[in-house]
Curated annotation (Swiss-Prot):
Homology family: Belongs to the UPF0294 family.
UniProt keyword list: Cytoplasm
Pfam hit, one: Exo_endo_phos
Subcellular location: Cytoplasm
Name this polypeptide is given: UPF0294 protein YafD
Superkingdom of the source species: Bacteria
MF terms (GO), sorted A to Z: catalytic activity
Source organism of this protein record: Salmonella dublin (strain CT_02021853)
Primary location: cytoplasm
SUPFAM superfamilies per UniProt: DNase I-like
HAMAP family: UPF0294
InterPro entries: Endo/exonu/phosph_ase_sf (IPR036691), Endo/exonuclease/phosphatase (IPR005135), UPF0294 (IPR022958)
GO CC terms: cytoplasm
Gene name of the encoded protein: yafD
Length: 266
């Protein structure tokens, strides 16, 4: 779906910018000069949340209370309403969205809000075979204080499909991106891993990419058929804290994770 795949970048005081997929992996970390690092602290805080197209009350309160202190906010089903765009541009240097499909007024898809400008941006889309609706993913790269580059993958996986062929197919280009990146990685989002074959495919992919799963002690993640849908995977970082915020502001609960970019745990 490369033809209709693009990202829209929202920056305060500037018109929205359309960004097309890069033509080669060689541009990872070379497309733009590294600017200010994502965090000046010895920690990176992220919020991961399927925001349910902002259909429920209190979604903005949750973002204001928990997103404003995060260096990265990875949203799925984010609809670019004026309220969300205003929050994003007022609190973050950049907000990149990959429209999965266009609703009557505003596009909906994954959206990554970041405290630094990405030096690389690659939008991805995959169409669900049954409903013919697209799901999107976004790969962005940010400089860290230790000069390493952090790759961030925001994923909303296909939901309605027979078997796992389309599910695994969506992971392939993500794997290509990660395989061409030597630095730390965070991959997170709504993976719709509601069946054992999907869960196995996701875990197999994580192993192949040398990604570890963030564990939540009080695990209040949204579940379907007894299996969690939202995940955070990582490599080259340490996990300091991980929690799940219970809220009625969406049909998913936000995940809050704090990483330190120091020497990764063994």
């Amino acid at each position: 779906m490369r033809k209709n795949t693009y990202a829209m970048r929202y920056v305060a005081g500037q018109p929205a910018e359309r960004i097309l997929p890069p033509r080669s992996f060689a541009s990872i970390g070379q497309a733009l000069p590294a600017g200010e690092p994502l965090s000046s602290e010895e920690r990176i805080r992220i919020l991961v949340w399927n925001i349910f197209k902002q259909q429920r009350a209190e979604w903005l309160s949750v973002l204001k209370n928990y997103g404003k202190d995060a260096h990265l906010v990875l949203l799925q089903e984010a609809q670019t309403t004026p309220e969300l765009v205003q929050f994003a541009t007022a609190n973050y240097l950049a907000a990149d969205q990959v429209p999965a499909f266009v609703l009557p007024q505003h596009p909906s898809g994954v959206m990554t809000l970041s405290a630094a400008h990405p030096v690389y941006c690659c939008p991805l889309r995959e169409r669900e075979p049954i409903l013919r609706l697209a799901k999107s993913a976004l790969v962005t790269v940010y400089p860290l204080p230790d000069t390493r580059l952090l790759m961030v993958v925001n994923v909303h996986a296909v939901n309605f499909s027979l078997g796992v062929d389309v599910y695994s197919k969506q992971l392939l280009p993500i794997g290509d991106q990660i395989a061409h990146h030597s630095g730390p990685v965070i991959m997170a989002g709504d993976f719709n891993a509601w069946s054992r074959p999907r869960m196995n495919a996701l875990y197999r992919f994580a192993r192949e990419m040398s990604l570890r799963q963030v564990r939540f002690t009080d695990d209040q993640r949204r579940r379907a058929f007894g299996r969690p849908l939202d995940f955070v995977f990582y490599r080259g970082l340490n996990v300091n804290e991980a929690s799940v915020l219970v809220t009625r502001a969406s049909d998913h609960n936000p995940l809050l994770v704090e990483f330190s970019p120091g020497k990764p745990e063994q």
